[in-house]
Amino acid sequence: MEEHSYIQKELDLQNGSLEEDSVVHSVENDSQNMMESLSPKKYSSSLRFKANGDYSGSYLTLSQPVPAKRSPSPLGTSVRSSPSLAKIQGSKQFSYDGTDKNIPMKPPTPLLNTTSSLSGYPLGRADFDHYTGRDSERALRLSEKPPYSKYSSRHKSHDNVYSLGGLEGRKASGSLLAMWNGSSLSDAGPPPISRSGAASMPSSPKQARKMSIQDSLALQPKLTRHKELASENINLRTRKYSSSSLSHMGAYSRSLPRLYRATENQLTPLSLPPRNSLGNSKRTKLGEKDLPHSVIDNDNYLNFSSLSSGALPYKTSASEGNPYVSSTLSVPASPRVARKMLLASTSSCASDDFDQASYVGTNPSHSLLAGESDRVFATRRNFSCGSVEFDEADLESLRQASGTPQPALRERKSSISSISGRDDLMDYHRRQREERLREQEMERLERQRLETILSLCAEYTKPDSRLSTGTTVEDVQKINKELEKLQLSDEESVFEEALMSPDTRYRCHRKDSLPDADLASCGSLSQSSASFFTPRSTRNDELLSDLTRTPPPPSSTFPKASSESSYLSILPKTPEGISEEQRSQELAAMEETRIVILNNLEELKQKIKDINDQMDESFRELDMECALLDGEQKSETTELMKEKEILDHLNRKIAELEKNIVGEKTKEKVKLDAEREKLERLQELYSEQKTQLDNCPESMREQLQQQLKRDADLLDVESKHFEDLEFQQLEHESRLDEEKENLTQQLLREVAEYQRNIVSRKEKISALKKQANHIVQQAQREQDHFVKEKNNLIMMLQREKENLCNLEKKYSSLSGGKGFPVNPNTLKEGYISVNEINEPCGNSTNLSPSTQFPADADAVATEPATAVLASQPQSKEHFRSLEERKKQHKEGLYLSDTLPRKKTTSSISPHFSSATMGRSITPKAHLPLGQSNSCGSVLPPSLAAMAKDSESRRMLRGYNHQQMSEGHRQKSEFYNRTASESNVYLNSFHYPDHSYKDQAFDTLSLDSSDSMETSISACSPDNISSASTSNIARIEEMERLLKQAHAEKTRLLESREREMEAKKRALEEEKRRREILEKRLQEETSQRQKLIEKEVKIRERQRAQARPLTRYLPVRKEDFDLRSHVETAGHNIDTCYHVSITEKTCRGFLIKMGGKIKTWKKRWFVFDRNKRTFSYYADKHETKLKGVIYFQAIEEVYYDHLKNANKSPNPLLTFSVKTHDRIYYMVAPSPEAMRIWMDVIVTGAEGYTHFLL
């Protein structure tokens, strides 16, 4: 609201100030603009290849330059008014003031009037310096940048049309949303404010409607006054709007433009040419019946009226008759083509040229033909400052018309306002964001490539920066590859390079890397740099080819780069009339380069051989590891099978135990059934005798009674025996059940333990299988890596051979058909340090001295002598060295090319640096090459590290002594074979004899894997025969000493191996002894545990047998409370009225079977703990005592489950009281009374005292 009030206040102030002198200022501005338009000016701008979301080709970009005729005559000349641009201090924001001074202008308005030379691209600061004088007043008004500017990096999205300037433009245009919805503004007249610019349909119609209402309210009081001012100025002049008047907002347009009703005061702002130039045949195939009749004219041109925040041009008859206007609507068939056109647009030069072409086209003397118009429009598609871009649906639905009013509404397709759902909107935003990110990446890579090329150009002129050009060239090549991946098609570069002038291209590439202050000097630099910046495809190739002519620093790690650089550096670049001295220098340089290439060849061969050895070693290790894992897996599988067998045995044992117990129970039951049958027979016999006794005569009654008495006694004895047997059978069954339970639990524990062991072994076997698979896969990966590295080395070897062949051809061409000499003295070693070359040459200013090489043989840097020979003057000592070498060559001191090469230095300075097995050796007067790192003559450190690594892995994995000794033997053989196969030549021809004995064996070491014996053994007799006799004697002495050293070394290794073997044997013996002791200890512990468990089980079994089958033991305490004891047992005494219990007594009726005569009679029983008797009476008065049972006679009380009671009134309520003499059968009146009596009587069953412990 504050911002709105500020804008309204400024509008009122300017209206008041401009009303007075509006006519005078408008006349002055018209004349001044005419003069400026007649003066030819070429506006230069800097094009940034900006492919981010700000200028995304997938959005609709509207360009609306409108030609306006000064007179209604068709022959009138269209005068183009140049835009007025103000240079704003502190930023690159320029504004175009396309309005008269009598029309009110608000401060933020220049945001919409800001122009650029190309599709909304910011203009260079130096390109518009000539406008600052006239527009200083306007620059003061524009010095304050709106907070929501399109130049702000935070607000570059499709909603940026609602910046402050956009709000002002919308207020100026009146209620345009009502026009869009179908309403009319005919009563309001033409809009009062005339501005140039473009805006888009807002993303949210609701927000646009809200803002439009505010606009109409804000502009209502001033409508009449503006109408009068507009009518006064309409006859003074009409403005011709430049082609970039709509470029800013058009570049940010994210939807279709707003439509409005064409009134009589409005000119159709924009016309579209046919799509023939784009090659789209759909345009011509579609019938005109697809569009309304009011849209199509005779020339098939589509009149697309657009009014948003821009000015409404005044309609004249001349403008209606001209079907061509200075701006076209380029409608690409897809966002891909739109992006291509946006990237291909170059500079404002093309825009101005096209404006001139449009100007010529409107002139009657320069009318455009059909072919010319196509060419102009095709050019415009690539050079247009603000081309409107539609998608495929809009292209097929559009037609051109001129001179006819457009309908009130127009169907909108594929725009953001036509999106109906949230998912469509999110997809629309996602596509635009991905496009912006991709184009930002293209911009970044392009800028990085250009900056790298410019830095290369800056370093190219410096002689000291030759060493860093190689990596920069690689950076350029890498950036070019990434750009090729991101480029849309080959047509983009064709459009871009074919249509871009060298001057424009240079300024485009230099814009991002130069500061703003340097932009003014781009015009002068463009002429000198036009010849350098050719199109991209040829420009980069020429630049890279020039840069590769400078030799990069050679390195043994990259033999190809070293050899190629040295080969390129020695190519003759002098005219044919060179002197003999220069030719000889070039030939010598070629010889040195040949030595480097030969050394590289030998090194590559050695590396290939080392890789083969590593592959063999990897195979051997894989076999050994797989064999170990296989053996361990087999042992685990065997143990697993054993444990499974033990588990099956335990299961069988459990089944057998169950079966045995069932058999025992069956036997006892059969025995008990036999005793029961016998007892039943005796009872039947006794019953028969009783019946006979009743029927027998008196004479036989006495005899029968005696017999009946004997039978009764026998029956009583048998019944007691049966009861005892039954009791024993029950005890036996309980004991069997207990044993079964204990044994079953033990067996189940063992079963569970073995099952856990089986599961763990299965997991271990699975882990072993996974480990074996992992080892095989790892070995396969290593093998693939070795094969890849070997292939790379073979390719490098082939390149070196090709370089050598090319070098020999060049040497032959320079030397007149002669080949390379075979003199060994001319074949210098490639591993020469820089100070070694600088000392004989006497000049060490350009190159830094190097006194020590790295230890790694693969990383030893080789310095070709060519660069030094070409850049440094030759000294007298060097010429003397050359003369000595020529003399030796004439004397025949040379070897064949197949023999090893030696390193020869000048006789003045024989010192050199050497690296042997990772140790730096100080320069010495004499050092055999057997200890130098030439041609891979020593074991590479990578092989030694590989051997040590494999040995440590074997020791960690616990290999036995045989495997260790075998590994040592193979390693020693591998070392000897590697050293003996290396090519070494003994340098013994140019050194004095007095220094031999002092310094010959300075580098000899027993720890080194290299040996002088193997190095010298490679020398053939031909090598030695050319030396003197003293040299032969020296060599023989050396061989003898080396043999002794080698024997000593072998002896030390053997003694060390024997010591390790003894230690390992002792360790294994100790380990075996400890395992035996641990096993014995475990066995004894398990045996002891078993004995303890067995004793405990025996004691528990005895204690269980001491307890009788009765429920409670007798109680003999004096303070025993019988009533509380019964209640504690769970009985409810109060509800059982058949029994009366006190603390010491229990009374109640029971039915008792007689002893002699088996009759059942009801008796009153009294259990008295004071008298310690269980007596029964005839009635409850306790007067007539019928019998007494003492506590000492009661043995046990139990329920009559065998139904032994004869003719019991109620067998279910019958229980027995066993004494020493007889068994009393009693029947309780109720079940609760029976349970209470049994618990009471058992407390006095003191006949069980012998079972107590």
UniProtKB/Swiss-Prot annotation:
InterPro entries: PH-like_dom_sf, PH-like_domain, PH_domain, PHLDB1/2/3_PH
Basic and acidic residues bias spans: 1-12, 126-144
Residue span of region Disordered: 1-43, 60-159, 187-212, 265-286, 525-567
Polar residues: bias regions: 29-43, 74-96
Source domain of life: Eukaryota
GO cellular component labels: anchoring junction; basal cortex; cell cortex; cell leading edge; cell projection; cytosol; intermediate filament cytoskeleton; plasma membrane
Subcellular location, record wording: Cytoplasm; Cytoplasm, Cell cortex; Membrane; Cell projection, Podosome
Coiled-coil residues: 584-696, 722-807, 1032-1098
Phosphoserine PTM positions: 71, 73, 157, 204, 212, 242, 245, 330, 334, 348, 351, 384, 387, 415, 420, 468, 489, 501, 513
Entry's Gene Ontology molecular function annotations: cadherin binding
A GO BP entry: negative regulation of stress fiber assembly
Main subcellular localisation: cytoplasm
Amino-acid biosynthesis in keyword set: no
Alphabetical keyword list: Cell junction, Cell projection, Coiled coil, Cytoplasm, Membrane, Phosphoprotein
Membrane topology: Peripheral membrane protein
CDD domains: PH_PHLDB1_2
Chain positions with Phosphothreonine modification: T504, T550, T574, T898
Function: Seems to be involved in the assembly of the postsynaptic apparatus. May play a role in acetyl-choline receptor (AChR) aggregation in the postsynaptic membrane.
Domain free text: The PH domain mediates the binding to phosphoinositides.
Subunit structure: Interacts with FLNC. Interacts with AMOTL2; interaction may facilitate PHLDB2 localization to the myotube podosome cortex that surrounds the core. Part of a cortical microtubule stabilization complex (CMSC) composed of KANK1, PPFIA1, PPFIBP1, ERC1/ELKS, PHLDB2/LL5beta, CLASPs, KIF21A and possibly additional interactors; within CMSCs KANK1 and PHLDB2/LL5beta appear to be the core components for targeting of microtubule-binding proteins KIF21A and CLASPs, whereas PPFIA1, PPFIBP1 and ERC1/ELKS serve as scaffolds for protein clustering.
Protein's name according to its UniProt entry: Pleckstrin homology-like domain family B member 2
Name of the encoding gene: PHLDB2
